């Protein structure tokens, strides 16, 4: 992987990730394909929304179908027939979200298989091996996603263990001869001094990109913005910056304003299945009765397949009848909305008009522009 940085506007960056499998224009949003599928979508449909890279889930693909089935096909690209780049998370977040059925040690994490209850163990080395078999174009280190709230002492211990696991991840990644990209993950909760230590330690180890982890886990938005404003300038400028698990459209806008290049989140697909659809002026809850006889498209400014062909009344009908097509059409629209938003942000950075774009974005939704505390 090669990262090219074209231009900046304030702290916002316009560039691209170059892989053997294709180019990803940044800032970029990655749809989430947890089980080797972006829910309800064919790879061709995902590509048609403008997505150039997707995310796969190491933890879930390890449990089902497993490494051996994956290797029978070649790798995850062959298994799911997605031709572009794939980023896989390390499995850390899923393991730590298991709560009482897992035990964290210095060696790794012992837990019960949520499918059948069998005891199972995952550590940095195993995570690197699974992601190698998946053929991931971007591999994520195995870390502990520090929960929120966490006091300073716990956050420090967690961050320090994640640094040790980062080194173990790097060593195993290299020993496998993996020629793809490996990203470090910055931890430290909402504490700036701990984030400083994490960034410094990861840069000393050396990675192809750096993710900001442990945010969007329940902390106030002001804390997320503050940490991004503090951390992003410390990440080497020639490396991509990835904000994990984020987020709402406004979170993408605020991340870009603070220097983030990459995002992922289940929100556009999950919300689509629940009838919450993102439009230029905010959010449409398509199951509400007021849409029953509305013959207008979901979003007159959207060029997606759904908006070009179907009315709000039809989408309302499908949702009320719990038809699978409704979830699919909603997903196509939400994914396209996110890709149109990212394209708009990229164009605004190119033209040096990002803050004008941001102001218009919030005006259309009837909300104030959040403060930006950067030099």
From Swiss-Prot:
Pathway(s) annotated for this protein in UniProt: tRNA modification; tRNA-queuosine biosynthesis
Disulfide bond residue pairs: none
Keywords: Glycosyltransferase, Metal-binding, Queuosine biosynthesis, Transferase, tRNA processing, Zinc
GO cellular component: cytosol
Region annotation (RNA binding) ranges: 245-251, 269-273
Subunit structure: Homodimer. Within each dimer, one monomer is responsible for RNA recognition and catalysis, while the other monomer binds to the replacement base PreQ1.
Protein name: Queuine tRNA-ribosyltransferase
Organism, as annotated: Salmonella paratyphi C (strain RKS4594)
